[in-house]
Design a protein with these regions (language model features):
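N-terminal ligand-binding lobe of clamshell/alpha-beta domains
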Residues: 1-262
Length: 262
């Protein structure tokens, strides 16, 4: 019996290398396929869109916060990989009675790399995970952006407006971009137009997910803060903490070039 610890310091015992894995977090699903688990992943969520050919082929077990528990039970997985923030606690607690559940808890690049290495070890892909972590770290080490002393409001939702606050993975990525989070609150607070005025961000990022902000929403924010730079950003680059981190540094370089240019 192999014993592991997840990122909540829970003990996970596995009698053998898992062969029937259900992943209920998009970025971690992509990671599993990147590490070569082509046949072991038997279930994913409807939001696990990468890689596309796997998204089309693998059974969907609901959404990240609305999992089909009965379907998951019927599939008889030997491991479920989840996340403290992206999944509902009540549902995960129910799944713990089905099979071992490994839960990640991501706040920054270090905890993301720890997750990648831990998951790699869990699924007998430790060497591949170590190589991936080294590649990601190397690319971030080459990301040298000036501290702009510009305040940014990173919007994740509309009606009500919600932003990414402190103590979030998104906040840690904003710091990598040399930006200061205009939100003083932790996690994902709601914000009003008046609150946005008081925060005085120099830059507003409108994320592509979870709310799909589009070009048409830029004017909406320009009416509130006409002098702020309002930019659409790829939410996956700021919030996916698996193998997609490989592409984040290059994206941040290009994004910040546009921020300083405008």
């Amino acid at each position: 019996m192999a014993v592991f610890h997840d990122q909540l310091n829970r003990v996970i015992s596995l009698p053998a290398v898992p062969k029937r894995i259900i992943s209920v977090v998009p970025s971690q699903t992509e990671l599993l396929f990147y590490l070569g688990l082509d046949t072991e992943v038997i279930g994913i969520t409807k939001f696990c869109i990468h890689p596309e050919h796997k998204f089309k082929a693998v059974t969907k077990v609901g959404g990240t916060k609305q999992l089909n528990i009965n379907q998951i039970k019927a599939m008889q997985p030997d491991l479920i990989i989840a996340n403290k923030e992206e999944n509902e606690r009540r549902q995960i607690e129910e799944l713990i009675g089905v099979c071992p559940v490994w839960i990640s808890d991501i706040h920054n690049l270090d905890s993301a790399l720890d997750m990648i290495q831990s998951v790699g070890t869990l699924i007998n892909r430790g060497v591949e995970a170590k190589t991936l972590c080294a590649d990601i770290l190397s690319r971030f080490d080459k990301l040298i952006l000036p501290i702009l002393n510009q305040r940014v409001a990173y919007f994740i939702w509309r009606k009500p407006y919600m932003v990414a606050g402190r103590d979030t993975f998104i906040d840690s990525m904003l710091q990598k971009c040399g930006l200061i989070n205009a939100s003083e609150a932790d996690r994902y607070p709601e914000v009003t137009a008046q609150g946005l005025l008081l925060a005085k961000p120099d830059v507003i990022f409108l994320s592509s997910e979870p709310y799909p902000f589009r070009q048409k929403h830029i004017d909406e924010f320009k009416e509130i803060l006409p002098n702020a730079k309002v930019i659409l950003v790829d939410g996956e680059m700021f919030s996916w903490y698996g193998s997609r981190l490989l592409y984040a540094p290059a994206y941040f370089n290009e994004l910040m070039y546009n921020v300083t240019l405008n």
